[in-house]
Amino acid sequence: MQIASRKVIAGLMVLALCITTLSSAGSDVEAKAKASLKTKKIFVKVGKKKSILIKNKTKKYSYSFTSSNKQVAKVTSKGKVTGIKAGKATITVKEVLKKGKKKKGKKKKRTLGKVKVTVTGMKKKNVVTPTPETVNKAAATAEVKTTPTATPSATAPVEPTASATPAASEPATPTPIVTRSPAPRPTLAPGMPELDKNNLTVADYPGIASDVPDLDIIRVGQNYYMVSTTMNLVPGVPVMKSTDLVHWEIVNYACNRFPNRDLFNLENGQQTYKNGSWAASLKYNEKTKLFYVIYNVNNDGFYCYTTPDIENGTWKAYYIQTSFHDPALIFDGDGMYVIYNGNNIQKISLKESSAEGGIGEVVKEGGSRALFNKTLGGFKWSLWEGAHAYKIGDYYYLMIIGSYGSWFRREVCYRSKKLYDSKASDWEAQLIFEGSTYEYGTGIAQGGIVDTIYGDWYGFLFQDHDGLGRVPSILAVNWDYVDTKNNKYYPDWPMMGYYDDKGNFVNCLGTSQKVKNPLTIQLNKSDKENYIVGDDDFSYPDFKEGDSLKKVWQWNHNPDDANWSVTENPGYYRIKNGKVAGNIWFARNSLTQRTVGPNFTSETCVLTENMKPGDYAGLAAISAHYGMVGVKCDENGNRYVFQGCNSDTNSGAKAKKEDRIEENDVSEEKIEGNAPVYLKIEYAFNTGKTRADRANFFYSLDGENWKSIGETFSLGFDTATTFMGTRSWLVNYATKEAGGYVDFDYYKVK
């Protein structure tokens, strides 16, 4: 019994010791495990709530929460944060020792840390669905002008709202919820169209499957106007019109002719291929009630054109012999400014010519300077150009194309609350788009932004598309983008991207990222088709000197007006060889039209009885180089159908007067009298799924039975030759003697 009792007592003592030890250890752990913040950042929408979490809380302490900006975010005593309005705030969290709990060495109060809060979006009650009732109500109270001289979007006095979620009856492509922009949303003016949710336009990729590079778009009223680059072609700087950002038609040209100089007239071996009019900028000024187009002509100078009527008016020209590469025009107050070379600014004014109908003068006001360094933001750009300039809300925005050394293009944006008097430190930089599309893998860049009458915003950029050229596309814009995956917020930046299958905005910021869906645009679909190419039977019964051909036509360089006609043989386009040219590059009066992808056909018919020995006439595919199907007249005056291409097809080969066409194939049939010869080129362009970029040539002597002739011609894009996408030309030129001519009966596209 005594032994047993001793064992029991000993066991109890050991157990007590273990309990004491464990209790002591637990106290040490508790002492070491201090409370800390689990929540470091919070993203919350207006009207929504989120809680701040604290690790290792104990009953000995209470916790206080203080907001640095209660107008943005409020916080309760329990740590619940409520978004009040879009913006940023900081919540300071403190730990306070409760009364009666103080021990020696313990602090009564300490700061646990700070929680960064970002509030985005708007309260649900502020989300407005544009219905016929609300549109009509707004229209009844509005006093905004509806003519093409209405106030441009960037300065319209409006109130921020958000557009609607898709209606149940809408097509499969989701209609996104468009977030706020830094500029207030417009009130619909009387007469503006109601938004029909069942008839919205959809932008696929590419937006226009044709060569429309360096585009600039503005909105005036409910109409959109676009200008682009056409290099050596005239009339130059085409003006296109749309009401839905998808369907476009050519309505005018800013530049009727280049100056009367050898390099613009293809005289004395000079030419301006890959040069001419570059990267035009288009603006409308509400104060002057004028439209302005500015652009640089390489090897010549800088031009500004103005007109009160962009669709039907004539243009007044102003000039200065200087170079403003890739200029962007912006008006600020009464000042007129040109942004060029990406980041340089020059104030200018316009001086009228003393001669009636003369060219006015562009005057530099003071010196030019760089607004900031292109390394701003830590970027290391190689290519960096093509600025577009805007004043929206509190900020001035510049949007520029950039690449790091590879060919992949990106769109970067810069902003400041000052412009002409800004310092470099006033500017910020942000990459706003880096990606491609499901249709093609090259980067999309160089462009700007435009809004709608309903307050939504869209980006317009272009993409290198090999032989087809540089093609434009429309992207979604989000001014209030929250990247929840990476915990990043981009307030007041025009982030570009697309909407996924659930209607969520997706920004592309990586070379492997792609726009995956067509874009439903919050505009009523136009009932018009694109008119950037078209047929012509050359019937101009009322044509008189100074009149123009159909808007789809442009000449290669300045035409020689004495040697073309649509009236000498009515119903035909006649090209006379006023001089010996030697090759297609120097042939005067060649008429050109764009091609359209992915498949396209050009067809014509030509009468050749009046050709002279050494003459070539027909239909040509002009790409990085040229291929042609047509009629040749040999040294004996006999005429045959042939197919050929230029002799120098090396990459980077420039147009030279010495170049001669190489005949790949000649038909056996001799052409008698004025028998018509029918010519056709069938194009196939690269897509994301097929590699083509080729042209095949055909001819017919009766217009019904077609024969293939010659070799398949490889298309391409070369900055050293034409710097343009593939075009079809109607051409006639002499290699031995002048005086011959041909008549083209029609031109058809399919």
Regions picked out by a protein language model, each given a short descriptive name:
Residues 1-12:
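Bacterial N-terminal signal peptides that target proteins for export
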Residues 13, 40, 50, 61, ...:
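Cysteine-rich, disulfide-stabilized extracellular repeat modules
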Residues 18-28:
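C-terminal segment of classical bacterial N-terminal signal peptides
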Residues 26-142:
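Extracytoplasmic soluble-region selector
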Residues 123-187:
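Ser/Thr/Gly/Pro-rich low-complexity, disordered linker/stalk segments of secreted
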Residues 176-178, 182-750:
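Carbohydrate-active catalytic/glycan-binding domains of CAZyme proteins
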